Amino acid sequence: MLPDLSAAPMQDRYGRPLRDLRLSVIEACNFRCGYCMPADRVPDDYGLDADQRLSFDQLETLVRAFVAVGVTKLRLTGGEPLLRKNLPVLIQRLAAIEGIEDLALTTNGALLARQAVALRQAGLRRITVSMDALEPALFRQMSGGRGEIDQVLAGIAAAEQAGFDRLKINCVVQRDVNEDQVLPLVEHFRGTGHVLRFIEFMDVGSCNGWRPEAVVTSAQLRDRIHARWPLAPLDANYTGEVAQRHAFADGLGEVGFVSSVSVPFCGDCQRARVSADGHLYTCLFASQGHDLKPALAEGEQGLATHLRQRWSVRADRYSEVRASTSRRRKPVEMFLIGG
């Protein structure tokens, strides 16, 4: 029996509050990136039936319940969220929820050019674009032969025109795969107002072939960049920010580093994730989720009570104990959880 915590502050077993919700609106993707959804493991026709995904009504109720227990930051993920039909309609509904201070979306950018204006008009405030290479052939290869860098760059340009003037650009760096793209990416985005962030290759899921030797640490990346463009550390924007921020000494913006492997940040993790079919994951490295649909059927208040109970027993800190523990269960794939 889970405790009744309806009147208590929303904290897990380590005193961590819940402030950030990553909400997957679709599990399907038009790319097949090797570290997430490799083509040899995930067929092109993979995906849930539409009626298995949470409806817009369910998603709105779910977000309202999360806001009731403390969430202020909402990020829509996938899969590729721009594949979700009528997404701007959903965004308009979510943007109207009182208490949501930040509404963002993560995309591979291939479909962004045609949707950027509608997303902005609907109330989306920020966009993060995943981009692991600038070189066209390598980009195509890393996306499983599905993506073209020109499409993504066009999407970024369209987002700028629509009023998204400060995008985040995420790059997952893998040794001997795309580490030679780090400096070209920095050179491309310096001075644009966008924030490039380098993410250590993580052991999320079980089909990406992760091994420690493939990780290029943030410290190594920072040293390479600093040797070309001197950097100075910046303070975090808020408690729980995952990226270590550094400013270019010449004033041409900043770059970030997400160091889940080499410098775990579990102690400040304030995030929950919900999959497109309504399962709650309290850690990106989870081996199982919790189906929220029964509680969701009880309405906003019933779900909020359930979330308080679930969060109160959260004790996840996988990245901190990665080296000293072995997984007993197969981890859930990142494209199902929603990175």
UniProtKB/Swiss-Prot annotation:
Positions that bind GTP: R22, R75, T106, K168, R271, A272, R273
* Cofactor(s) this protein requires: [4Fe-4S] cluster
Query: Known Pfam families for this protein?
Result: Fer4_12, Mob_synth_C, Radical_SAM
Q: Which GO terms describe its molecular function?
A: 4 iron, 4 sulfur cluster binding; cyclic pyranopterin monophosphate synthase activity; GTP 3',8'-cyclase activity; GTP binding; metal ion binding; S-adenosyl-L-methionine binding
Q: What is its EC number?
A: 4.1.99.22
Q: List keywords of the entry alphabetically.
A: 4Fe-4S, GTP-binding, Iron, Iron-sulfur, Lyase, Metal-binding, Molybdenum cofactor biosynthesis, Nucleotide-binding, S-adenosyl-L-methionine
> Which residues are recorded as binding S-adenosyl-L-methionine?
Y35, G79, S130, M202
Query: Which residues are involved in binding [4Fe-4S] cluster 1?
Result: C29, C33, C36
Biological processes per GO annotation: Mo-molybdopterin cofactor biosynthetic process
Q: Which SMART domains match?
A: Elp3
Q: In which pathway does it act?
A: Cofactor biosynthesis; molybdopterin biosynthesis
The signal peptide annotation in the UniProt record is none
Enzymatic reactions: GTP + AH2 + S-adenosyl-L-methionine = (8S)-3',8-cyclo-7,8-dihydroguanosine 5'-triphosphate + 5'-deoxyadenosine + L-methionine + A + H(+)
Q: Which residues form the Radical SAM core domain?
A: 13-249
As to how many cofactors bind and how, the note says:
Binds 2 [4Fe-4S] clusters. Binds 1 [4Fe-4S] cluster coordinated with 3 cysteines and an exchangeable S-adenosyl-L-methionine and 1 [4Fe-4S] cluster coordinated with 3 cysteines and the GTP-derived substrate.
Question: What does the entry list as the binding residues for [4Fe-4S] cluster 2?
Answer: C266, C269, C283
Keyword GTP-binding annotated: yes
Say which enzyme class the record assigns.
Answer: lyase
What domain of life?
Bacteria
Its family?
Belongs to the radical SAM superfamily. MoaA family.
* Quaternary structure (record): Monomer and homodimer.
| PANTHER family named among the record's database cross-references | MOLYBDENUM COFACTOR BIOSYNTHESIS PROTEIN 1 (PTHR22960:SF0), MOLYBDOPTERIN COFACTOR SYNTHESIS PROTEIN A (PTHR22960)
- Functional summary from the UniProt entry: Catalyzes the cyclization of GTP to (8S)-3',8-cyclo-7,8-dihydroguanosine 5'-triphosphate.
What is the protein name for this chain?
Answer: GTP 3',8-cyclase
Q: Which organism is it from?
A: Xanthomonas campestris pv. campestris (strain B100)
